[in-house]
């Protein structure tokens, strides 16, 4: 076996050519391990968060799993606690070094993953992103406490939003299907939340706890939580005006104890616009099956024509 294809290992360490057996404290009847180096083997470096650099002998064809196993051999860190980063990207276990174009003497970064834990990101309205170490079983209360530890914001002033939904304190991250590296949005709750009322066509009145800064989307999500009505079937009316999703309650001057009206949008309903000769645009809620007579009747209801 040509020397350049031999790698000798003793006590978990690869032996360097210029050193002596005595340097490695190899005594009589010691056992060395011979590993064949495929042509094309190479060295890469791993940098930990503590600043320590580890050198690994690898092949381009090694998978990320293999690399993590080598790190375990050297450092004793279980693979499931290792995250490897290269060129700003987290490396996936089944892929090879070649897949990521990792070449000889490349440097990877090793980040430790807490047991069963994961990282999530929290983005504030100022654009700042906070990184948190969490567990899937953490409640929203726990997450708010972690944010308080990092940022000093009292939990009762925090509102956390994920996938357009405000997260409730007693629920867990798993309940909301929040997974590793998900991004939550943090909105500060101004002291001064308020109650508003939502009246349905059946005459039922729903009470909601809201903030002036809540968007109409948020309000519809709260109605969904209470009543199970999907937001896309809700139309909210205040002072004769249909409220638009991206706007806030403050935009419409909706104050404490205001009453909104909830109209259900039939599945398959749609909005169309009618432009008059004066340039005014009227919005109509219609169904594809509406006749032109129906449409004219709706225009009469709205405009008296």
UniProtKB/Swiss-Prot annotation:
Domain (Ubiquitin-like) ranges: 1-41, 42-117, 118-193, 194-269, 270-305
Pfam families per the UniProt record, alphabetical: ubiquitin
Keywords attached to this entry: Cytoplasm, Isopeptide bond, Nucleus, Repeat, Ubl conjugation
Cellular component, GO, one term: nucleus
Location in the cell: Cytoplasm; Nucleus
Cross-link (Glycyl lysine isopeptide (Gly-Lys) (interchain with K-? in acceptor proteins)): 117
Family: Belongs to the ubiquitin family.
Extra remark beyond the main annotation: For the sake of clarity sequence features are annotated only for the first chain, and are not repeated for each of the following chains.
Name of the protein in its database record: Polyubiquitin
The organism of origin for this protein: Linum usitatissimum (Flax)
